[in-house]
């Protein structure tokens, strides 16, 4: 874990100590089979009883001459800071929120609105619209905006928890996939709940780059813990 990731998580240590019963943390490794890239994430979140919640996510990637090797010369990929408010009407949870992503030479501002409908004890569905404004600090590339839509469906059975997710993005200025301004992703997640622990695996389908129509498989494995 690099110094920036450690510093980001350190900022929330008082929260973990004083509100340990309501904190969720997870760590995750990611591998892309075509680009041979490795990424790692550390995440921590908390929601208060009044509905206000916030989270910090720190992402690093393998660098140096062997980016295809996990945990090799880790470099900072970016950080995300989220604040949100959640309230319920019946079986639907509504969540307006705002995400700030910071990286090397850019910042992205992401207001969003999410709704999650609990159908019964096993099934739930959700959707989120997010507007993204990409602000660049250099003159090489202009700022850009992206409209993004996420949809989810989840099913719980005994200790298993399955989630399928679909993502659609449309940019204003720059290409995202196959020479066009549209892009999409699919993701399937399986988690197994063991008391407060939740190990999980994910398999996704994502684009390789913005110029070709090639797709690649994204593998993720991680573990979460709820205090």
Swiss-Prot record:
Signal sequence coordinates: 1-22
Keywords: Signal
Keyword presence, Signal: yes
Keyword Signal recorded: yes
Protein origin, superkingdom: Bacteria
InterPro entries, per database record: Bact_OM_Channel_sf, Oligogalacturonate-sp_porin
GO biological process, one term: oligosaccharide transport
GO cellular component, one term: cell outer membrane
GO molecular function, one term: porin activity
UniProt-recorded name of the protein: Uncharacterized protein YiiY
């Amino acid at each position: 874990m690099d110094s920036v990731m450690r510093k980001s998580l350190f900022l929330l240590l008082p929260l973990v100590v004083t509100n340990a019963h309501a904190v969720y943390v997870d760590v995750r490794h990611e591998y892309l089979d075509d680009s041979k890239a490795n990424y790692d994430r550390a995440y921590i979140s908390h929601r208060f009883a009044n509905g206000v919640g916030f989270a910090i996510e720190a992402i690093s990637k393998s660098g140096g001459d062997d980016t295809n090797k996990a945990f090799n010369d880790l470099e900072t990929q970016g950080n995300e800071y989220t604040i949100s408010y959640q309230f319920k009407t019946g079986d639907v949870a509504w969540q307006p929120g705002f995400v700030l992503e910071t990286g090397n030479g850019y910042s992205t501002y992401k207001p969003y609105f999410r709704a999650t409908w609990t159908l019964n004890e096993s099934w739930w569905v959700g959707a989120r619209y997010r507007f993204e404004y990409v602000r660049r600090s250099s003159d090489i590339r202009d700022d850009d905006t992206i409209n993004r839509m996420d949809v989810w469906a989840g099913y719980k059975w005994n200790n298993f928890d399955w989630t399928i997710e679909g993502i659609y993005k449309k940019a204003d200025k720059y290409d995202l996939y196959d020479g066009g301004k549209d892009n999409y992703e699919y993701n399937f997640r399986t988690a197994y709940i063991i008391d407060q622990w939740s190990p999980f695996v994910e398999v996704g389908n994502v684009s390789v780059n913005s110029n070709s129509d090639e797709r690649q498989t994204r593998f993720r494995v991680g573990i979460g813990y709820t205090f």
